[in-house]
Amino acid sequence: MAKVQYFGTGRRKKSVARVRLVAGDGKVIINNRDIENYFPIETLRVIVNQPLVLTETKDKYDVLVNVHGGGFTGQAGAVRHGISRALVKADENMKSSLKKAGFLTRDPRMKERKKYGLKKARRSPQFSKR
């Protein structure tokens, strides 16, 4: 009999995470590396584990993630979004608590584009009176 897997795709800023949940003992593997090695900052690991802690499924599933694009924070948010979506596919009853916590909502905030005549998105060149 094949192992039951649940898939979820998460996005945040420029990052895209493809998440697989497999029945297991709570290991989180990101890009073939352990979560402690991939996210050295504790707050990022907390962000990734939030949906599992909220639904009390930390020890039920192994989480296998493939994530690319963006930086650390964007990738952590994308992984959290993907795990939440996969948990909903695994158990529909978790949807209300995850939605209430805001983990199923795609964060729409993106980097604002640079405009011509300006140094950055909103920063204008230095003004000289004389």
Curated annotation (Swiss-Prot):
Q: Report whether Ribosomal protein shows up as a keyword of the record.
A: yes
Q: Which GO terms describe its biological process?
A: translation
Q: Which UniProt keywords apply?
A: Ribonucleoprotein, Ribosomal protein
Q: List the coiled-coil residues.
A: none
Annotated Basic residues bias: 111-130
* One annotated Gene Ontology cellular component of this protein: cytosolic small ribosomal subunit
Question: Which Pfam families does its entry note?
Answer: Ribosomal_S9 (PF00380)
User: What are this entry's molecular-function GO terms?
Assistant: RNA binding; structural constituent of ribosome
At the top level, the lineage of the source is: Bacteria
In terms of Gene3D superfamilies, this protein maps to: 3.30.230.10
Q: Which InterPro entries match?
A: Ribosomal_Su5_D2-typ_SF, Ribosomal_uS9, Ribosomal_uS9_bac/plastid, Ribosomal_uS9_CS, Ribsml_uS5_D2-typ_fold_subgr
Keyword flag Ribonucleoprotein: yes
Residue span of region Disordered: 102-130
**Of which family is this protein a member?**
Belongs to the universal ribosomal protein uS9 family.
Q: Write down what this protein is called.
A: Small ribosomal subunit protein uS9
What is this organism's lineage? Bacteria, Bacillati, Bacillota, Clostridia, Eubacteriales
